[in-house]
């Protein structure tokens, strides 16, 4: 059995423009995240837990978009969207796995900022390199079995009628729409998993930032306040964008009722947000900008 991804076939006149835009954005994501990883690797001032997590986040972003965009570009180029059941399941599994890991990693990054700002004296002990690695491993090991189980549950459903997916990649809502019979249990599972990987992490991040903001307001130094807010604001912007889009997609009452608006929202969190993330982190982060200037100065001399 195979599916057909409709993608953007409803706007054929814009195919080549969309191909050019998405290709440019994909290259920007690869380049910007690659630069962030390189800067953190080679610059001594960036050898801290915060930037260790940021480099892992950048690597996740590269993998996250690579699951979606190259396949989408190929479908636009060939104007065909045929995809086998196995390829569809694999794409969805890896997409959810990487997305879920990003949610947990963003929570870890918020915890890192909480310890750094609210408990600065304990920070070197609490967030040592071993703990950082354990937190990264935990983010992956929690996500992998849950996502594999959910993917198997969805693709064991019987599919009948049309095999066309009104989307540009294999995601849960449009796949559930093709399933036959009662999908109530699957919908409940989707909501439970979404609560675990979206709602709970978001609430933990909100609590962390509530304590961070409360602590920042107690600082007597205006410079200290500005530096603390600058450090945290970029992370908070990314959190709001990413979790907001995820909530709209996976926590709506009927996630399988996924039409044009769902496709636009998916573009937002699969392409637009990953394009903006490196820009947000670099432009609002003085340490990254200083490291970038030093790297450019070395390359130009």
From Swiss-Prot:
Residues listed as glycosylation sites in the UniProt record: 82
Q: Which GO terms describe its biological process?
A: detection of chemical stimulus involved in sensory perception of smell
- Which subcellular locations apply to this protein? Cell membrane
Xref: Pfam families: 7tm_4
Q: Mind telling me which Gene3D superfamilies this protein's record contains?
A: Rhodopsin 7-helix transmembrane proteins
**Disulfide bonding pattern of the chain:** 88-180
Its biological purpose: Odorant receptor.
Q: In its UniProt entry, what is this protein called?
A: Olfactory receptor 10AG1
